[in-house]
Amino acid sequence: MSFKKRGQASLALSLAICMGAASAHAADDGLITKPSKYSVEETVARFEAAVKQKEAAGFTVFTEIDHAAAAKKFGLDMRPRTVILFGNPKVGTPSVIKTPLVAIDLPPKALVWEDDQGQVWLSYNSADYLFNTIYKRHGAEAPAATAPIEKVLDEMSDQATK
């Protein structure tokens, strides 16, 4: 292979690795992070709209917390970071009734944030992590199948970021 072709192959491999790093990924800690092509404000609005489209299935947006706005009140500067509390009370409420301490971790949250390079991201806990780690630590009973909930989370996050 010529030097030029090796260089092109190396460049192609480097680009593929970089592109893979920019796509959605789930860390070992259950956190799923997806890049957004929108601003923080638009990603928040799109995620909340996606959750509201699932109202018939029981999903709702409870509130949002704008960390940057709160920091500004105290003279602190931070890049945009907004937490959205959302969930499905049909699923979460029975768990909270039966195991009150699970409420410290419910409702689920999504974080929309901007990194130092200006890239916007949406992060949330996977359904598997929520039910098999968080519920487990409280001794709460988890649903038998997490895949359908994971699919809904994936759809909502894709709608917000793509």
Where are these regions (language model features)?
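Bacterial N-terminal signal peptides
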Residues: 10-20
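Beta-strand/loop substructures that line and gate deep hydrophobic ligand-binding cavities in soluble
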Residues: 109-139
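Bacterial N-terminal signal peptides that target proteins for export
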Residues: 1-12
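Terminal, regulation- and interaction-focused segments at domain boundaries
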Residues: 25-58, 162
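Short beta-strand element of the conserved SAM-dependent methyltransferase core
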Residues: 33-34, 84-87, 112
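Stable alpha-helical elements in mature extracytoplasmic
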Residues: 43, 47, 67, 145, ...
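Compact, glycine-rich, soluble single-domain proteins
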Residues: 48, 52-57, 63-108
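C-terminal partner/receptor-binding element of secreted or periplasmic proteins
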Residues: 127-162
